Amino acid sequence: MASGTFDIIHPGHGFYLSESKKLGGDNAILMVVVATDKTVKNHKRVPIVGEKQRCEMVSMLKGVDEAYVGDEKDPFKIVKEKKPDIITIGPDQNFNPDSLHKSLLKKGLDIKVVKINDYKKFELDSSCKIIRKIKQTDFDMDYLENCQ
């Protein structure tokens, strides 16, 4: 099981999800929990893309078998329901794997937690870098006004 914001999809997301699925072996089912809009706003910034659309986009990515919007009241709800063998933490996520594992054990869930550290660097390897690049780009306003 992987989780994240997935606001503006970029190659780093694909790498994270691909590495997450590999950990499960040949017949792995990759489940992804997409952060709610409120969670994103509280921990990062206001999301550009809404949670339902982000979840649908993630569900379309290669290797993803199931995608869910997280639960605002209980962040462990989907984990308790689906009981994955492994939970992966992305390279940009500030969770301590040992702390998360201990929290899971307290809830009666003995789930392996793995931090995905290897991260292929791309010029635009984060949503923030993409947003910054868009802000710096001199767009033809006529084109943007006619965008549908």
Swiss-Prot record:
Its EC number(s):
2.7.7.2
Keywords of this entry: ATP-binding, FAD, Flavoprotein, FMN, Nucleotide-binding, Nucleotidyltransferase, Transferase
Q: Specify which residues bind ATP according to the UniProt entry for this protein.
A: 5-6, 10-13, 92, 119
- Which reaction is catalysed here? FMN + ATP + H(+) = FAD + diphosphate
- Organism superkingdom: Archaea
- GO terms, molecular function: ATP binding; FMN adenylyltransferase activity
Cofactor(s) required for function per UniProt: a divalent metal cation
One of the protein's GO biological processes: FAD biosynthetic process
Q: What is the top EC class of this enzyme, as a single word?
A: transferase
Annotated signal peptide: none
Pathway assigned in UniProt: Cofactor biosynthesis; FAD biosynthesis; FAD from FMN: step 1/1
Kindly indicate whether the keyword Isomerase belongs to this entry: no
What does the protein in this record do? Catalyzes the transfer of the AMP portion of ATP to flavin mononucleotide (FMN) to produce flavin adenine dinucleotide (FAD) coenzyme.
Q: Which HAMAP family match?
A: FAD_synth_arch
State the PANTHER family in the record. Answer: FAD SYNTHASE (PTHR43793:SF1)
Which NCBIfam families would you find in this protein's record? cyt_tran_rel (TIGR00125)
Protein name, UniProt field: FAD synthase
